[in-house]
A protein has these predicted regions:
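C-terminal and inter-domain tail/linker signature
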Residues: 1-146
Length: 146
């Protein structure tokens, strides 16, 4: 993570991302409030820690080695925004709203931004912004992609 003052909020964000990177779902869920909301592109809205972990696990199934690295972090009193670079290899099925994309073995690098709101020292809300065409192009799932 980029150098920032280490606060309880920053520590929770690091624990959250590290847990995702390791697919450590109990730790991932422990960083979220019971009524947390997580939103992904394409309309995936996940309510509560269990739904959030199950929803984002779709990406770990498709890209088992998927990891995120925070390259910029901006924090406020109870909010944060992170610029994240996701890297991995498409070795599992990717379930999408329009069907399942079989594994291609292709590597990906996807740039994203994620915004967070906190309640106490836990994540209450997160919204993930990433370019779906960057991901689909990398795995050859766009028309004309080679």
């Amino acid at each position: 993570m980029a150098a920032v003052a280490v606060t309880p909020m920053v520590e929770v964000l690091q624990r959250y991302l590290d847990a995702f990177n390791r697919a450590d779902w109990p730790t991932y869920k422990s960083t979220l409030t019971p009524d947390s909301v997580h939103i992904e592109p394409g309309g995936m809205e996940l309510h509560g820690p269990d739904a959030s972990a199950e929803g984002v696990n779709v990406f770990k199934v498709a890209f088992p080695d998927l990891t995120g690295e925070v390259v910029r972090l901006i924090t406020g009193d109870k909010e944060a925004a992170a610029e994240i670079v996701w890297t991995g290899t498409h070795t599992g099925p990717l379930v999408t709203p329009s069907g399942t994309i079989p594994p291609t073995g292709r590597p990906i690098t996807v740039h994203a931004t994620k915004v967070f709101a906190f309640e106490g020292d836990l994540i209450k809300y997160s919204r993930h912004y990433w370019d779906m065409t960057e991901l689909l192009g990398a795995i050859g799932a766009l028309p004309g992609a080679g």
